[in-house]
Every structure is written in structure tokens, then in C-alpha cells.
């Protein structure tokens, strides 16, 4: 049952925010379109990963690929939320971190093993940028949808940091490993729920603003 929850149920919930985003796409700002493509790529890669898993084929190379796309799309999402100087800095961090991911996959950690170094660095970057959003963006410039989405990302990457950092030391099939993956899957559910609410909130806020213009 735990295997089904971790491998199928939790990843499949990404379809909820994707469905809402498709319906609301025309009204979404550029920042949320980065989130939309983040969801699409996550769904596609997770779907292929599930198929490979059932064929007993190592699907970890897909995780290396997913990390690369996650960093690019999420950091470009964040770059839309900050003023110019911070936005440019976030983009520089994005490309440096992508270079590290490439180096990690080619020389440090095999694509057939869990890329814990890259995932750990990714988690740290997203955590720091999320905190920077709450600290540096003026309250009047924060939108309800971005607050929901950034909160979800902060929760997910903060909660998953331990998993990314120590995954290679958690033996497969060990009780602790199963518990950690269960917690991670639960956080994924919360992330997708908050993104869904954020996309819905964006539509409502934009509609309200338009009606008074």
C-alpha cells in the first residue's frame, strides 16, 4: 500500500493543478506559466518513471533530467517576482546551478544513482529564494496566489531536504527509508494542493480587478 501511495497516488495528484491551469491558462501571468510547465514536465517524467519501474528498469536517469528542468522553471518563476537586480541575480544562480547539475550527472554521481548532491543543492536554493521572497518583496506587491505557491515550494523543499541529502544512506526496503518516502509523498500532495489553490486564487483576483477597471 505504501508503494502505491509513494509511486502512483502522490505523483498522480499533479493532474489536479494541471487541469485547473489548462482551464485558467489564458488569464495566468508569465510567472504562473512557468509553474504550469513545471507541472507538465513533472507529470510526464513521473509517468514514464512509473512505467519503467513496472518494467523493472532503472528510472533514476529521469530524476537527473527532472532536477535540471525543475531548477530552470522554478528559478525563472521566482525571477518574475523580484525587482530587476534580484531577478537578474536569480537568473545567474539558475545557470550556475544548472551547470553544477550537468557536472554532477556526468562526473560525480552516476545517472543510474540518486542524484542527492544536485537535489540537495536544488533544495537549498529554492528554500533560500523562497525565504528571500517573503523578506524582500514588499507586502503590497505580494499576490495571494504567489504566497500560496511559494509557501508550498518552501514546505516541499524544506521537508525533502533531509531525503535528498541522506538518501544514499537510507537502505532500500529499510523501515526508516519507507517512512521518509511516505512523508515526502505527503508533502508532494500538499504542494500540489497549494499550487491548485494559488492558480484558482489568481483567476478570482484578476477577475475582481478587471470588474472594477
PLM regions with names:
Residues 1-213:
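Terminal, non-globular segments
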